[in-house]
Amino acid sequence: MLILETVPLLRREVRRWRQEGKRIALVPTMGNLHDGHMALVNEAHARADVVIVSVFVNPMQFDRPDDLARYPRTLQEDCEQLNRHGVDLVFAPAAEEIYPQGVSQQTYVDVPALSSILEGASRPGHFRGVATIVSKLFNLVQPDLACFGEKDYQQLQLIRKLVADMGYGTEIVGVPIVRGEDGLALSSRNGYLDSDERRLAPRLYNIMMQLASQLENGERDLEALLEQTASRLRQAGFCPDELFIRDADTLGDVNVDTRTAIVLMAAWLGQARLIDNVRIAFNADA
């Protein structure tokens, strides 16, 4: 497995594989890898000849400097895990390699329709940072496909729109959420939980599924349902951050044409901001 830190070396290897007619998959990550990331790698292996994983804690997508500073950096362990999973190349650049003139001087990419709604409304600049780094990686690697987790659902939809709008020839593959046996979605930020919080954390999933069940049973007073769910979260020890019921395809409000809805949740538990989502049939009989 190759571990590269510079753009010229990355391009050299990509050029070689292209000349050999290889199909290339990219898995962008910020490191601190877990089984959810390995599911992305496995999906990439199933669809391509060569798997490239980027490990880059992207400063442009952090809206809080303290969050950026404390984000776990575990490159050695990440590379060992990726090597065991047969990854061909790890691209682990420094911030100066990606943003040589600094973040403030970097040309950026924005997807206005999806960057400022939902999670983007409370995290200004976050999705601009995501769109910019993904665009740069796509330009460097020109992958045939790229794998992203469905846990970050708004991010996944934003990247799909980015690819469609900009004419990238990259297939975007969404990979289902990987959960622990207790239902908690795997996340690098789960490491912020202490032992008591970790025991409590699966309640987020349980409460989300309770809301999903109410929707599937035909309850349609969405405002009341969201208030009930927020109350359940608070009673369980969470601090609700974001809670939405949206059309799964457009991320707009559900309406008579919605066939699949999605519940999007974010809540704080101690120092960890936990996110989750579930899609449900909506207006199935319409």
Swiss-Prot record:
GO terms for molecular function: ATP binding; pantoate-beta-alanine ligase activity. It catalyses: (R)-pantoate + beta-alanine + ATP = (R)-pantothenate + AMP + diphosphate + H(+). It is an enzyme of class 6 (ligase). Pathway: Cofactor biosynthesis; (R)-pantothenate biosynthesis; (R)-pantothenate from (R)-pantoate and beta-alanine: step 1/1. (R)-pantoate binds at Q61, Q155. Its EC number is 6.3.2.1. The keyword Cytoplasm applies. The active site is at H37. This is Pantothenate synthetase. The lineage of its organism: Bacteria, Pseudomonadati, Pseudomonadota, Gammaproteobacteria, Enterobacterales. ATP binds at residues 30-37, 149-152, 178, 186-189. It holds the Pfam family Pantoate_ligase. Keywords: ATP-binding, Cytoplasm, Ligase, Nucleotide-binding, Pantothenate biosynthesis. Belongs to the pantothenate synthetase family. The reaction proceeds by a bi uni uni bi ping pong mechanism. GO terms for cellular component: cytosol. Its main location: cytoplasm. Homodimer. GO terms for biological process: pantothenate biosynthetic process. SUPFAM superfamilies: Nucleotidylyl transferase (SSF52374). InterPro entries: Pantoate_ligase, Pantoate_ligase_C, Rossmann-like_a/b/a_fold. Beta-alanine binds at Q61. It is found in: Cytoplasm. Catalyzes the condensation of pantoate with beta-alanine in an ATP-dependent reaction via a pantoyl-adenylate intermediate. HAMAP family: PanC.
